[in-house]
């Protein structure tokens, strides 16, 4: 089961979502998250911090985390 995290409300509840029994993966919808957070770019520090929080919640709860990235170098930035 994949939980798609793509808005500020989901970010606010990320630890509770990651703790749900049966969730296998947190998938970051970075562009939707960017819009929801009122940022102009997915590279905005607010969005970068949000993605880091999602990754940390995934690690803390033993969940995989996924996100589309344009290159493998970009993926290495997050994972």
Regions found by a protein language model. Give the residues of each.
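Expand to "…catalyze enediolate/carbanion chemistry for C-C bond making/breaking, isomerization
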Residues: 1-79
């Amino acid at each position: 089961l994949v939980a798609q995290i793509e808005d500020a409300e989901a970010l606010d509840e990320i630890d509770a979502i990651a703790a749900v029994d049966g969730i296998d993966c947190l998938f970051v919808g970075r562009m939707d998250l960017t819009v929801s957070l009122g940022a102009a770019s997915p590279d905005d520090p607010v969005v970068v911090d949000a993605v880091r929080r999602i990754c940390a919640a995934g690690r803390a709860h033993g969940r995989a985390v996924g996100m589309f990235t344009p290159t493998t170098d970009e993926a290495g930035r997050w994972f």
